[in-house]
From Swiss-Prot:
Its EC number is 1.8.1.22. GO terms for biological process: tRNA wobble position uridine thiolation. Heterohexamer of two alpha, two beta and two gamma subunits. It is found in: Cytoplasm. It comes from the Bacteria. GO terms for cellular component: cytoplasm. InterPro entries: DsrC-like_C, DsrC-like_dom_sf, DsrC-like_N, DsrC/TusE. NCBIfam families: dsrC_tusE_dsvC (TIGR03342). Its main location: cytoplasm. One of its GO terms (molecular function) is sulfur carrier activity. This is Sulfite reductase, dissimilatory-type subunit gamma. Belongs to the DsrC/TusE family. It comes from Nitratidesulfovibrio vulgaris (strain ATCC 29579 / DSM 644 / CCUG 34227 / NCIMB 8303 / VKM B-1760 / Hildenborough) (Desulfovibrio vulgaris). Keywords: Cytoplasm, Oxidoreductase.
Length: 105
């Protein structure tokens, strides 16, 4: 277990930098991941994906498959990669505070 501190707030993360506790997610976490992923600004499109991922996780306890993410947000995979350069799993799920996906997200 590792710890990341950003703007005075500490987060426990796994070996890949994902939050250990979903309930620790907060705006400071988003800012931290945004900077570490090299994303300049969080747009409404970013927020739409984050909100969907969080809602899906709260209901199902897992991250959605990519096709479910695409179908429900209206974004093609290419567009998700444009928003989150490291992809839907590493970038989007991490920013949304989800644990590291085990499947194909």
């Amino acid at each position: 277990m590792a710890e990341v501190t950003y703007k005075g707030k500490s987060f426990e993360v796994d070996e890949d930098g994902f939050l250990l506790r979903f309930d620790d997610w907060c705006p400071e976490w988003v800012e931290y991941v945004k900077e570490s992923e090299g994303i300049s600004d969080i747009s409404p499109d970013h927020q739409k994906i984050i909100d969907f991922l969080q809602d899906y996780y709260k209901k199902n306890g897992i991250a959605p498959m990519v096709r479910i993410l695409s179908k429900n947000t209206g974004f093609k995979l290419k567009e998700v990669y444009e928003l989150f350069p490291s992809g839907p799993g590493k970038g989007a799920c991490k920013m949304a505070g989800l644990p590291k996906p085990t499947g194909c997200v």
